[in-house]
Amino acid sequence: MLQAASALRHAKRILVITGAGLSADSGLPTYRGVGGLYNGETEDGLPIEMALSGPMLRRDPELCWKYIAELGKACLGGEPNVAHYAIAQLQRIKPECWVLTQNVDGYHRAAGSPPERLIEIHGQLSPLFCQSCAAQDPQLSEHLQRPLPPLCRLCGGILRPPVVLFQEMLPERALETLYEQLATGYDAVLSIGTTASFPYIHEPVIRTRVSGGFTAEINPQPTDHSAQMDVFLQCRAAHVMAELISHI
């Protein structure tokens, strides 16, 4: 841990990559899926990749929204944990520290991470927006208590959250921001609670290693990336992040 703290202390530009494991201590499941909520088939007999997809939202919005609502209720029912607050503290200490998250729970924002240095690569749950007229609606929690799918109060169109469902493209602006920052480079990358091998996850790690920077991972179990890291801390982020930041 002291090696990681020393490297982060001396680094100017830092990227913190976070996945579903970070929010496990907030009570959210870590199964694979949008927001890390599902694994395998749904109770409707469909793979979650089909039920919670862009095409399904268009074809059968009521079915798709059934699972969006479960995701929404899980996220709204939790709150940021000590690791989210520690990351926000690191961003206050280091004005060029960025967060790249796969999570859609909004906990980084709630914990105080500055939105201008937060890349939510899978989007976020709110505000909802109308697929017909694009009007925004901030009342996610209220809609989850009503019949689904939620409808636009202006035109009656079907609302949706700005999350990336299965078979949908990543948000263009988030990708642009990520690769703009990657072009500048990072002195250190800290990966927390993610097992994903998507290019936008492992590319920052590889680029930073190649350029001579420092890489570290915090995860309860080793991942495909662990052996390539300078430091691997096998634990939950909530158990170590506050202490790690206290040494910076």
UniProtKB/Swiss-Prot annotation:
Task: List locations, semicolon-separated.
Answer: Cytoplasm
What does the note under cofactor report? Answer: Binds 1 zinc ion per subunit.
Write down the EC number. Answer: 2.3.1.286
GO MF terms held by the record:
histone deacetylase activity, NAD-dependent; metal ion binding; NAD+ binding
Which reaction(s) does its UniProt entry say it catalyses? N(6)-acetyl-L-lysyl-[protein] + NAD(+) + H2O = 2''-O-acetyl-ADP-D-ribose + nicotinamide + L-lysyl-[protein]
An example of a Gene Ontology cellular component annotation for this protein is: cytoplasm
Alphabetized UniProt keyword annotations: Cytoplasm, Metal-binding, NAD, Transferase, Zinc
Deacetylase sirtuin-type domain: which residues?
1-248
* Chief location: cytoplasm
Q: Which InterPro entries match?
A: DHS-like_NAD/FAD-binding_dom, NAD-dep_sirtuin_deacylases, Sirtuin, Sirtuin_cat_small_dom_sf, Ssirtuin_cat_dom
Q: Which residues bind Zn(2+)?
A: C130, C133, C152, C155
UniProt-listed SUPFAM superfamilies: DHS-like NAD/FAD-binding domain
Cofactor(s) in the UniProt record: Zn(2+)
Query: What does the record give as the active site?
Result: H122 (proton acceptor)
Tell me the residue numbers annotated for binding NAD(+): 19-38, 102-105, 193-195, 219-221, 237
Q: What does this protein do?
A: NAD-dependent protein deacetylase which modulates the activities of several proteins which are inactive in their acetylated form.
**Family membership:** Belongs to the sirtuin family. Class III subfamily.
The molecule here is called NAD-dependent protein deacylase 2
